[in-house]
UniProtKB/Swiss-Prot annotation:
Subcellular location: Nucleus; Chromosome
Main location (coarse class): nucleus
Role according to the record: Protamines substitute for histones in the chromatin of sperm during the haploid phase of spermatogenesis. They compact sperm DNA into a highly condensed, stable and inactive complex.
Keyword DNA-binding: yes
Gene Ontology molecular functions: DNA binding
Region (Disordered): 1-62
Annotated Gene Ontology cellular component terms: nucleosome; nucleus
Source organism superkingdom: Eukaryota
Tissue: Testis.
InterPro entries (alphabetical): Protamine_P1
Family: Belongs to the protamine P1 family.
UniProt name for this protein: Sperm protamine P1
Keyword terms, alphabetized: Chromosome, Developmental protein, Differentiation, DNA condensation, DNA-binding, Nucleosome core, Nucleus, Spermatogenesis
Amino acid sequence: MARYRHSRSRSRSRYRRRRRRRSRYRSRRRRYRGRRRRRSRRGRRRRGYSRRRYSRRRRRRY
């Protein structure tokens, strides 16, 4: 029971914080939405490539 109560309070605080942030930085998000999307896509692609390459090298070595 104690555990359940703790998790419930945590989720409540998180929801409140998220709501406030959205209302505050709504205009900013609209302005830099394209830039953020492009950055995230590039980072994901680069990370995936490096991981695959490193895994292949390690396998060959071992």
